[in-house]
Amino acid sequence: MRKVVLLLAMVLGFVSVLAACGGDQAGTDPQTNENNEETTHEGNTAESLEHATLVWYLIGTPQQDVDQVMEEVNAYTKEKINATIDLRLLDWGEFNERMQVITTSGEEYDIAFTSSWANNYALNSRRGAFVELNDLMDKYGKEMKELIDPAFLEGAQIDGKLFAVPTNKEVGQQAVLAFNNELVEKHNLDISTVNSLADLEPLLKVIKENESDVSPIATFDAYLPFDSILQEEMPFAFRIDGNTDEVVNKYEEDVTMETLKTMHDYYKKGYIRSDAATSTDSWPLETPNWFVRKELYQPYAESIWSRAAGYEIVTRPLHEPYVFNNSVTGSMQAISTTSKNPERAMMFLNLLNSDPYLRNLLDKGIEGIHYEENEDGTIKDLDARIERYNMPSFAIGNQLILKLYEDDPADKWEAFEDFNTNSVPSPVLGFYFDSNPVRTEIAAINNVTSEFSPALLKGAVDPEEYIPAFNKKLYEAGMQKVLDEIQSQYDEWKANQ
């Protein structure tokens, strides 16, 4: 139900409030002059800038020690750019709705988390909620621009304009099958031959016959090889292979039928739980009651998952990593058009994404209180970080300047760079659909999709019976009009590339 509410909010949108952008015409990330004063690229010392307080809305569960850490952060940012940060964490379940209210009310703020899935980047950018950043970044964000993978900066542009600073992390999106390695080794199973959903059958059979307390499959939506428009479960998509210039209804494609037939076969054989379509079980890693699950990968994700689970997890890829709009806009920071200090906000984002001290302070907390640093520069969490300062690392900023944990591979960030280099751009990377002309039809189609897709994608119903009924209702809801509108916008976009 939460996905339905989020999507409807994204589609129906809200009234944007435009405000004049003012603020100090100051420089960017400070440097040290001959008198050991902090200076900007414009030659101003930090002290010469009028003090600014920047309001920053960030997604994540509020943490007990935020105020303590922000005292250290603000001492540093005041010295560097004469600004202090008013960090406001909004919990995961309320962030999207709260940001809509904040935006429609015209409340003044400076920076906010935005993405393809929360505080929607494309919709807010088109409706004037975010400041265009191209010139600001060139003037005040030079250091971070050198560090952020160009694929993020290019792929996140809407009609040639960038409206938020992407988090430098894994740029590609890759679905993998993750296995409970205790069960793999116990039954001497060979996962090296698993390259698709269909390849799982003999392994699932062994688990079903020998592990009565284990679900062979931890419930997941089947992977389908498309670049989706709007949400993954929605029907509008472009193919990754073949004719990539035609928008399609993915539920009319042969590969979808074959994949969902496999899922339903597994469901009938008891490899998938009988309540898969309605269950809210999140399948926590620390509970080893599963054999295989689908996850989104990043380099050395196995180490992260194994650390969280308390037992080893191993993986097999379902496809090569692709760069989608959703992956380049998965975590970003935007500057509000209501901000009175957009230049200073950009200076802060530049510092956040290029200064390892500030980035680690916001992410890990205070050394000696929240974490300890080893002689080799690696770190380990203390109880205070786990219990009182567990921040959403991916949502803050540049991942590749974070300290490594003591059990992280030494080449972790180099592996990220290799992963990004080898990620393949989607044929439609950079095309952002404006849903406003067909928002009524999309709302109706969303209702139909929420009725049919959960059971279909999880294998709980026969696709040969269910998909025809699903498609009939989609077209009754206005499917063809939406497909035509997407195609028209795409053709215009493609002609201008």
Briefly describe each language-model feature range:
Residues 17, 22-497:
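Extracytoplasmic/secretory soluble proteins
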